[in-house]
Swiss-Prot record:
Pathway: Cofactor biosynthesis; NAD(+) biosynthesis; deamido-NAD(+) from nicotinate D-ribonucleotide: step 1/1. This is Probable nicotinate-nucleotide adenylyltransferase. NCBIfam families: cyt_tran_rel (TIGR00125), nicotinate (nicotinamide) nucleotide adenylyltransferase (TIGR00482). The gene is nadD. Keywords: ATP-binding, NAD, Nucleotide-binding, Nucleotidyltransferase, Pyridine nucleotide biosynthesis, Transferase. GO terms for molecular function: ATP binding; nicotinate-nucleotide adenylyltransferase activity. Belongs to the NadD family. It comes from the Bacteria. InterPro entries: Cyt_trans-like (IPR004821), NadD/NMNAT (IPR005248), Rossmann-like_a/b/a_fold (IPR014729). Catalyzes the reversible adenylation of nicotinate mononucleotide (NaMN) to nicotinic acid adenine dinucleotide (NaAD). One of its GO terms (biological process) is NAD biosynthetic process. It catalyses: nicotinate beta-D-ribonucleotide + ATP + H(+) = deamido-NAD(+) + diphosphate.
């Protein structure tokens, strides 16, 4: 019997993708060497956050430019972008398991999502559906909760890169060209006047 292919799930707005995302992916592939592939899943509307700024087409194009700099296998899936209304992780995971029955999944989330994971729809069911949840640090060391519920969580040793899509968009809104965006992505943003007033 063939072993299932271990695959990471990394969702987010990616509006725009930036060097923080790069550091996270590099740390993940380094610390989880048996993971064969990552599915990048941009969301149309996060139920705990606001609306997106860029069109689905622009986000997919930025992500294609972003992943072109990686040698590892990263696949971009648009199933949440095409989903009307908010996207829920449990529904996405269950859909992926139906579409890819030969794969076993792990989930990749940020420390902010770790802190409010109990607010996610059917969060306990999510832990039943994936082998492990990897948490990347954004601002500081995080002390894991001493709870059976959170025994499946593992923290990555990713570099703390002070970059967020929200802050980068704000820089563009203020007519400042930010750093921490890969050159190909930045060129696309400027050429298409994304995030311009």
């Amino acid at each position: 019997m063939t072993s299932p292919i271990l695959t990471g799930i990394f969702g987010g707005s990616f509006d725009p993708p930036h060097e923080g995302h790069s550091g996270i992916l590099k740390s993940f592939f380094r610390e989880v060497p048996d993971c064969r592939e990552i599915f990048l899943i941009p969301n149309r509307q996060n139920p705990l956050k606001g609306e997106k700024f860029s069109s689905s087409e622009n986000i997919l194009e930025m992500l294609n430019l972003f992943v072109s700099e990686f040698s590892e296998t990263i696949r971009i899936l648009d199933l949440e972008l095409n989903h009307p209304g908010p996207s829920y992780t449990i529904e996405t995971i269950q859909k992926l398991k139906t579409l890819h029955p030969n794969r076993e999944f792990v989930l990749l989330i940020g420390e902010d999502n770790y802190s409010n994971f109990h607010k996610w729809r059917n969060y306990e069911k999510i832990l039943d559906e994936v082998r492990k949840v990897f948490v990347f640090r954004r601002f500081s060391e995080v002390v894991p909760r001493n709870s059976k519920l959170f025994s499946q969580f593992q923290f990555l040793k990713n570099p703390l890169i002070p970059a967020s899509s929200t802050d980068l968009r704000q820089s563009f809104f203020q007519s400042t060209i930010p750093d921490r965006i890969p050159k190909k992505v930045l060129d696309y943003i400027l050429r298409n006047r994304l995030y311009s007033k």
